[in-house]
Amino acid sequence: MKNIGWMLRQRATVSPRLQAYVEPSTDVRMTYAQMNALANRCADVLTALGIAKGDRVALLMPNSVEFCCLFYGAAKLGAVAVPINTRLAAPEVSFILSDSGSKVVIYGAPSAPVIDAIRAQADPPGTVTDWIGADSLAERLRSAAADEPAVECGGDDNLFIMYTSGTTGHPKGVVHTHESVHSAASSWASTIDVRYRDRLLLPLPMFHVAALTTVIFSAMRGVTLISMPQFDATKVWSLIVEERVCIGGAVPAILNFMRQVPEFAELDAPDFRYFITGGAPMPEALIKIYAAKNIEVVQGYALTESCGGGTLLLSEDALRKAGSAGRATMFTDVAVRGDDGVIREHGEGEVVIKSDILLKEYWNRPEATRDAFDNGWFRTGDIGEIDDEGYLYIKDRLKDMIISGGENVYPAEIESVIIGVPGVSEVAVIGLPDEKWGEIAAAIVVADQNEVSEQQIVEYCGTRLARYKLPKKVIFAEAIPRNPTGKILKTVLREQYSATVPK
């Protein structure tokens, strides 16, 4: 039976002296043998708190070796980790604790004010029996035993519950099992060029699925994880050189920041091979900037529900297929579902995925779980197109698509054009009701109005987009509302600006 905690134990047996986790900012350096021992002590602490198989343990912590080992320790007990975004406000965290039925909450020092606010509520989460801060955890770990837990668990047993962003209401808890996480890590490790003793930089938060899966596949492949809890573009290149980093994880926005610092111009990092990125297509110009430094870029498309797996655009195709999310990873099928409900290998439609990497269910939401699947295919809610070579191009979210005069208009396509207008710093395109067309595309733009006007934006789009795709309305705003994970709240924008459209 596959158990993620057991995998760490096996790596500690095979490679006991190999560095597992390095955090230069705190001078933490831990081998796989040491990390496994710490995971066992974490399991002992959890057992003393009454945690048993199936119980939920909430982790409200920044990246740290303790986060990793609490996750592994819970896995060894058959308990279920609930990683929580440290940027969430008290009411949002409180909802997750209540919805997940978490029994123990372990939190870092920066989250203490949020925890205090939750505990001061008139009706705090009733299932929580213990609130463990960083100091209390450290004290308990000092006296904990490092023996391997003797618990039979793994396979289809729940491993973690991770809550989606919730742009349209309360977030849903995505349940992954030991099996789905093992499959996702295997899929990544079998698709990309990752080698034993590689050193991988992780500046992304572990409460997100891609980073958490990276932690796990690092143990699977015998990789050293270089952690950067607080991303700093001015320090990252020196860290890459000093720690002989081979691979880095980042989103396109971070990569754009990194190339603007002075250190990038003088960069000499012979060990570094490539970045893995996702969340948005990498601009072709940025790919070329990194290629000039002999740094390749691997891009991916994934969801929390697919445990960070889905498609990958390997570096050899980065320019030839610029704008694509790549092809399906190993052990994964990706297709499109047409309006007629037929699943097709090529063409345009809703992106669907079939694989062992998929979620088991949405926590306590059987109807949402049923609606998410079509004969084993997970419906992503994204609109995409798969070309004749099997490369996926994401068009937009299904729920955000605008139907104007009978034509499908994809906001993401318009946004990708408007962001190229000099002076524009942010943009969100939404559909607003229109008596003539049914809906029109409206662009909410954050820009310096001394540099750019509505007419300039429309004219710029007119040379790059079909006429029916042009924004019929441009609204300048000081800011665009986002949720704590940075996703634009288009429901808020639609509510805010619908009243401005003449009837």
Swiss-Prot record:
Its EC number is 6.2.1.3. Changing R9A: Alteration of the strength of the membrane binding. It is a peripheral membrane protein. Pathway: Lipid metabolism; fatty acid biosynthesis. It is found in: Cell membrane. Disruption phenotype: Inactivation of the mymA operon causes altered cell wall structure, reduced contents and altered composition of mycolic acids along with the accumulation of saturated C24 and C26 fatty acids, and enhanced susceptibility to antibiotics, detergents and acidic pH. Also impairs ability to survive in macrophages. Changing R195A: Alteration of the strength of the membrane binding. InterPro entries: AMP-bd_C (IPR025110), AMP-bd_C_sf (IPR045851), AMP-binding_CS (IPR020845), AMP-dep_synth/lig_dom (IPR000873), ANL_N_sf (IPR042099). It catalyses: a long-chain fatty acid + ATP + CoA = a long-chain fatty acyl-CoA + AMP + diphosphate; hexacosanoate + ATP + CoA = hexacosanoyl-CoA + AMP + diphosphate; tetracosanoate + ATP + CoA = tetracosanoyl-CoA + AMP + diphosphate; hexadecanoate + ATP + CoA = hexadecanoyl-CoA + AMP + diphosphate. Keywords: ATP-binding, Cell membrane, Fatty acid metabolism, Ligase, Lipid metabolism, Membrane, Nucleotide-binding. Pfam families: AMP-binding, AMP-binding_C. One of its GO terms (molecular function) is ATP binding. Changing R244A: Alteration of the strength of the membrane binding. Its main location: membrane. One of its GO terms (biological process) is biological process involved in interaction with host. Changing G406L: No effect on the formation of acyl-adenylate intermediate. However, it shows very poor catalytic efficiency to form acyl-CoA. The record marks R9, R17, R195, R197, R244 as: Membrane interaction. GO terms for cellular component: cytosol; peptidoglycan-based cell wall; plasma membrane. The record marks T214, A302 as: Important for substrate selectivity. It comes from the Bacteria. Induction: Expression is controlled by VirS. Induced at acidic pH and in macrophages. It is an enzyme of class 6 (ligase). Required for maintaining the appropriate mycolic acid composition and permeability of the envelope on its exposure to acidic pH. Catalyzes the activation of long-chain fatty acids as acyl-coenzyme A (acyl-CoA), which are then transferred to the multifunctional polyketide synthase (PKS) type III for further chain extension. It has preference for the fatty acid with long chain length in the following order: hexacosanoic acid (C26), tetracosanoic acid (C24) and palmitic acid (C16). Belongs to the ATP-dependent AMP-binding enzyme family. Homodimer. This is Long-chain-fatty-acid--CoA ligase FadD13.
